Amino acid sequence: MSDAPCPVPSAKADDGWQKAYRGWVAGNDWPWLCRYKAANLSVNARPDVVFMGDSISELWLVRDPAFFRAGRLDRGISGQTTPQMLVRFMADVVALKPKAVHIMAGTNDIAGNTGPTSVEAWRNNIRAMADLARANGIAVVLGSIPPAASFAWRPGMQPAARIAELNGWLKGFAAERRLVYADYYAALAAPDGSMKPGLSSDGVHPNAAGYAVMDPVAEAALAEALKVPTAGPPSKPRR
């Protein structure tokens, strides 16, 4: 165990430094706790909501910055899977004491970004993050996995059916636990399970137009979540 500080980029950090830093993260900081450590220390007021997720959450701030008005924090990390998010959930969500958390995760679990996994492992990680939030008085929004017919970084994979399956479970789990389900899939998906034309440049990550479609879904879900009591244990036993 070490309290060694996180690496800090110099003012002249170049692509070579960034590549080396990514290598350091892969070998020394699997959940990437360092990614938001400094930003978390600078949070002085209770956030309204923290967005936990992968690149789809991370890029939301980049491509739709107006959505992240005061009180909304983005803690997405590109490429991450649910086990990585679960490890950093205490530091990047619970410790900040937000009123609500928005969890959107599963694309990279399906892709196998951190190795072999299973549907049940993904479910358990979602359950664990939701339980941690509720136990700490944080309202929970579960965002559906956005549609995709293929992944450029996983040639040959056809994820559309799996995405629909996992979203079906998310919707049921949210209803069971009295959490809020944000159905981005319904707003973004074409009939074949791909992203609707014009909403993404790669079929996976929403572009500015895609996030514009997601915004009202998120706003409605957050408004609903902040009305739901969060104290106490889950209302029903796990399946």
Locations of the language-model features?
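Oxyanion-hole/transition-state-stabilizing segment in secreted/luminal serine hydrolases
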Residues: 52, 57-75, 82-123, 146-150
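N-terminal secretory targeting modules
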Residues: 1-50, 62, 66-67, 96, ...
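A short helix->loop->beta-strand "cap" motif at the edges of active sites that frequently abuts
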Residues: 136-139
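Short, flexible loop segments at the rims of nucleotide/cofactor-binding pockets, characterized by
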Residues: 25-30, 77-81, 159
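Surface-exposed amphipathic alpha-helices with a cationic face
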Residues: 130-134
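Charged helix-capping and loop-helix junction motifs
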Residues: 118-127, 160-166
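Catalytic His-Asp segment of secreted/periplasmic serine-dependent ester chemistry enzymes
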Residues: 146-239
